[in-house]
């Protein structure tokens, strides 16, 4: 015959609710398997749901308001089938939110169909189609069944076992457990005190480790709690660890020999010589006491703490013979006499020297005159070239010229606009009236001079002037040709310069930093490789 199948579940009884409350009060809300062992017909998951959905005193079981209904419908629309999240936002159990949502749906459907609205109880009953003997899927959120007049044998046995286990918090057994716990604590404190006394005597002992109640229990008597060992790094620090370990052992040995306070005082004396010298200085009270007992032949006068005696040389003249000089003239005579004696003691001069005259400045003067003549000739030629007509060359790009100010507000902006217009039209800048008057006067004088010269009938003069003008025109054409050649060369060189500048910028800004970073990575990896090879050789040996 097959064994019977026991299904854990169904509606909760009043006795089961009382046992669950008492178990949560003792074991807390994390040990549900231990709590479920007290209940024969329920498992750990069902106990947890029953507590979180129904028995928890912090839950809100009041009726829903209109604002809460509106909020519930909005949350269901935004978070479909996420009842845990909706219950947290509403501050109510998830099953209560589901039931309220079903009620709202049924009322809306009944209104659309034209049926009469039913009450809340009938809505709840009709929302689930269950038969009386079937197991309720949300039994943990339903009300508990009332107790019968007489309990069954299973319930009576379950209640007696729960009483035996849960009533340890009161009575003789509870006091005995508290007494045992206090005894263990006093034993532990006595062991720690004994260990401290033995350590001061130079005997190192270790405490007996108590049995752990659970696997991850922390022993706070250990040296380091929650110690995190640093990971192995690129550099070898074994020698540094050995040095620190040795220094720690020396420190502990000195503490064990001399004690902490004495060792601290010795360290302070060794580390602070200034404090040592300050300690050696006598206090004011000591000075008063010693000054009363000092005599003329006392050894305290020759004490090392005193400053050494100042030994001065004997004076050259007595203080009685010294007097302030009244006549400054006698002092000047004495100084003069002293200087003559010093000069007479010097050796006689040999006079072995020759006077070298500097070169004459005639050549320099001639060079200066020739430079002045050349400058005057250049000035005259430039003036003549300025008067002659010339072809204009657009060396400067028109895009480089700035724009004109639309509404000039002061004299500076008006002058600025004039200069820009002159630059665009390649016209000469405007000259003031005073300068124009001077220019007209000079021009009239030059015209008179030229007319006087042309009135002469000497053919040689006319030929010479004609030849000079031809030469000047030839030179002007030659310079114009050279300027045009330079302009063409500039147009060729300018893109090359820009390209070169762009290449230099890319090299400096991107390539050189990238090269440095790659070089650094290479050196670090090469260093790591060498270290690994070295350790591999050591291990193989």
UniProtKB/Swiss-Prot annotation:
Transmembrane segments: none annotated. Disulfide bonds: none annotated. Residues 263-273, 280-289 have a biased composition (Basic and acidic residues). Residues 290-299 have a biased composition (Polar residues). It is found in: Cytoplasm; Nucleus. Residues 116-127 have a biased composition (Low complexity). Residues 115-152, 250-299 are annotated as: Disordered. Pfam families: Myb_DNA-bind_6. Its main location: cytoplasm. GO terms for biological process: generation of catalytic spliceosome for second transesterification step. InterPro entries: CDC5L/Cef1 (IPR047242), Homeodomain-like_sf (IPR009057), Myb_dom (IPR017930), SANT/Myb (IPR001005), SANT_CDC5L_II (IPR047240). It comes from the Eukaryota. Residues 32-55, 83-105 bind DNA. Residues 234-262, 462-494 form a coiled coil. GO terms for cellular component: cytoplasm; Prp19 complex; U2-type catalytic step 1 spliceosome. Gene3D superfamilies: Homeodomain-like (1.10.10.60). GO terms for molecular function: DNA binding; second spliceosomal transesterification activity. Keywords: Coiled coil, Cytoplasm, DNA-binding, mRNA processing, mRNA splicing, Nucleus, Repeat, Spliceosome. Residues 1-59, 62-109 form the HTH myb-type domain. Involved in pre-mRNA splicing and cell cycle control. Belongs to the CEF1 family. Associated with the spliceosome. This is Pre-mRNA-splicing factor CEF1. It comes from Candida glabrata (strain ATCC 2001 / BCRC 20586 / JCM 3761 / NBRC 0622 / NRRL Y-65 / CBS 138) (Yeast). The gene is CEF1.
